[in-house]
């Protein structure tokens, strides 16, 4: 709760605050309802919940939430490992989540994980991912995010997927990117996507995160590193970088270990040293 409250004062406009998953499956995500009941809710900040299935969606819509995210893996093997369903069954489950969210007047983002590669199957066909994306839009998804679950993406994969999406009729305004920094390609992938017109990116404060069902996965690109980069590229994020760094340091204090974010330690490019 302290971390979410800290983040909600930085200028971020969207925060994925909780996940409605089985506590016995991922203990760290337990207590979603209690968290939502306790956080501050400043104007202009949208709080969403990750849900794996219809049951999770039903629990989420009973709480004070602004939107849902549902994840479907492009890799059948990863889907079985992650949610114990085939990709086809997971797509059906996602359609149910979208319907539940819309019935509750909530927006729903569909996230396609392993969109750039799978730790079990290797390469993932971007045309397959684009076909899944079109199907999810047809089911009513309000936004699409494409997850680089184990940091396998490079600019070549990013361009290939965007080419496939555009060819399938998916506009970049419907696209968000979700990069992990496992192989230190997260930021260059963001620059590549920016150059193609993508303007929405997932990130995690301090670089927290990973996936228990994706061997070798590390956290998402650190939020403060992303904000620093895109501001230096001339984009106005509306986010207070100094406040974001304070949130990253708080996150590090809460988890009790060193986080991989760089800007939280070095500071902005033009921060000078007092002598």
Question: What is each residue range found by the language model?
Answer:
Residues 1-275:
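Catalytic cores and adjacent flexible loops of soluble metabolic enzymes
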